Amino acid sequence: MKAFFNPVNRENLDFFFPKTENRIGNNIQIYEKDFPNLEGVKIAIIGVEEERNAADNLGCGQAPDAIRKQFYRLFAQNNMPAIADLGNIKIGKTANDTYFALSEVAAQLIERGIVIIILGGSQDLTYANYLAYQQLGRTINITGIDQKFDIGDEHADIKSDSYINKIILSNPNVLFNYSNVGYQSYLVDTEEIKLMEKLLFDAHRIGIVKRDLVECEPVIRGADLVSVDMNAVRFSYAPGCNNVGPNGFSGEEICTLTNYAGANDRLSSFGIYEYNPQLDIMNQSAMLISQMLWYFIQGVSLRNNDLPDIAKGNFYKYFVSILDTYQIVFYQSKTSHLWWMEIPINENNKEKISRNYIIPCSEKDYLTACNEEIPERWMQTYKKLIP
């Protein structure tokens, strides 16, 4: 694996953080001369300086080290999981070569049960991240925190604003569901909205999400891979992005969403993309990203394998009948109080899609069912599972 990486520059490293204090940079393994020992590592940080397929955002390839300068300065958390910064992926002769390197590294780390953090770079790197799961033969859910869907034209070359189509059309296809959190209607073609509906993908508009952020927690809890486009954050909080606008998530909101991602027992990949240091003002965007990482890591530290398993006796199980037509089974954790619901499927298919027939939900979904209404989240998944 070492052959895929360039070490973190030692000269810059001395500037990153004070050496005498309890900073994150003093409490993690960093690839300087010797490649980190991955035994016992919970989180691996991967920088990728690839920007050749960025959509009007050249300069975002400089992001990884700019983020490190701010991230390493933050104070370490109590009970912080073991972290290794593996350095930056060596840029290939072509962008596809970089995709290959990233997918190979990601596949090896995921197979070892190590959560990966990708510091882009342009967001088309999400496609390379997806290829790692394809290589492993794992069906996954992807959640994109983004102001757009990034679907693009099926005949167009891959770009950071058109990579989802490449994932949808990949063969073999291991994508079960794609969810968007934070799209802005005036930036999205109505035809793309119709396509999302046709494909039974989830789309959550920025205004609805901001009104009740907690309702998007189950969306993120159901993801294996979360990809964050920094253009989803409004300009006043993250000016260092070429396509950012006046509306979007606040700093507090995006940190909450990344904390949800970290706490998700299912999630194995997390990436932050499209930050451009050349456009940043007083390192404000880099500081916000470093805090997003801090909250993500805090979420990982709080994981406790909180998944429905009635045999262990750690969940309540509720049966809700709706108009004598449907019976929906809900699960509530006795420790976290989070909710899940079960989708009835053919017993022969349960093993194939076992990670998807019990899906995360909210208490609001349970209360909706108690009022004899079918939760939209339940129906959406039911349509995907029952042809």
PLM region descriptions:
Residues K2-I45, E51-I272, N276-P387:
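Conserved alpha-helical scaffold segments that buttress catalytic/binding sites
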